[in-house]
């Protein structure tokens, strides 16, 4: 957001999320902005417009973290050393064997409610 200019979706996000999350984030942005605009034009209440960026950024950073997590867990860089490879393998094994980790992965993959 810059003054009265509001960005949403890919226009607002520097790094696109992986794992088919881009459209979900864009829709969430627009949903929040639409509700804020509706309140503003119905009653003059600017609170939703003022909190738009902060509200969206909380979700965006969680999505970016999840994208980073998935990418670093599932893709091997060409210059990966054996220590990093073992850390990556341990993370994948943890996600595959822990109910708590699986639940967290599912929550982040399927979607985040307003954070």
Residue ranges of predicted features:
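C-terminal helical "tail/cap" subdomain of flavin- and related membrane-associated enzymes
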Residues: 20, 35-115
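FAD/FMN-dependent oxidoreductases across multiple families
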Residues: 1-22, 44
């Amino acid at each position: 957001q810059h003054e009265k200019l509001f960005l949403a979706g890919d226009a607002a996000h520097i790094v696109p999320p992986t794992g088919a999350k881009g459209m979900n984030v864009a829709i969430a942005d627009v949903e929040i902005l639409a509700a804020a605009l509706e309140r503003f034009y119905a009653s003059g209440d600017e609170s939703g417009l003022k909190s738009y960026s902060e509200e969206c950024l909380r979700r965006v950073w969680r999505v970016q973290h999840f994208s980073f997590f998935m990418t670093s867990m599932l893709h091997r860089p060409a210059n990966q050393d054996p220590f990093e490879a073992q850390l990556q393998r341990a993370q994948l094994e943890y996600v595959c064997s822990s109910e708590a980790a699986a639940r967290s992965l599912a929550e982040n993959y399927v979607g985040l409610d307003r954070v």
